[in-house]
Regions:
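Short amphipathic beta-strand/extended segments with alternating polar/hydrophobic composition
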Residues: 104-113
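Residues on a specific face of well-ordered alpha-helices
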Residues: 17-20, 24, 126, 130, ...
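N-terminal glycine-rich phosphate/adenylate-binding segment common to multiple enzyme folds
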Residues: 1-5
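Short active-site-adjacent structural elements
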Residues: 87-89, 117, 151-152
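Conserved phosphate/ATP/ADP-binding segment of small-molecule kinases
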Residues: 8-105
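Charged C-terminal helix
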Residues: 139-152
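Short Gly/Pro-enriched loop/turn and capping motifs at secondary-structure junctions
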Residues: 85, 133, 149
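Short, small-residue alpha-helix embedded
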Residues: 114-138, 142
């Protein structure tokens, strides 16, 4: 749908509307921050202007939560990926991911290992799907990924 605050050219308003209908039937969605903003009609630039604030991740969680809370949806878990953020306790910027599952919000971080790589979201989705088949909750799925398990 988009990345780094930019919507892909192929992502038309009609496709956006259809994507919103489609995700309402999913049990788990894994949008990056741009995609979350597109799905919720949120302003990416307006949100990311708070990236240096201690409550930045809370702001993102508040944007994501309503996707789970409507009667028209069956979404159980939202995993917002690829959030660049330097938490007050960090000495450097890291990639953060928010897992909204049941009534809990988990924050998972990983150092930046050389940059951004195409296909990592697809890999994450595969791990999430396999974990669901195994009956694991999503935080357990993250712990099975070596790049994250040492950071949890």
């Amino acid at each position: 749908m988009g990345d780094s605050g930019v919507k892909y050219d192929i992502f038309t308003p009609r496709l956006q509307q259809q994507m919103q209908k489609l995700v309402s039937h999913a049990d788990v969605i894994t949008p990056n921050l741009t995609e979350l903003c597109l799905l919720t009609h949120s302003d990416f630039a307006g949100l990311t202007k708070y990236k240096d604030e201690p409550d930045y991740l809370d702001r993102i969680a508040r944007i994501a939560a309503p996707l789970k809370e409507t009667k028209e949806t069956q979404i159980q878990t939202i995993i917002v990926t690829g959030i660049l953020y330097q938490a007050p306790s960090d000495d450097t910027v890291k990639y953060y991911n928010l897992v909204l599952e049941n009534d809990q919000i988990s924050v998972i971080s990983s150092g930046i290992h050389g940059g951004s790589y195409s296909g990592t979201g697809d890999l994450l989705s595969a791990v999430v799907c396999a974990s669901m088949v195994q009956g694991k909750v999503q935080l357990q799925a993250w712990k099975s990924m070596p790049v994250y398990s040492k950071d949890l």
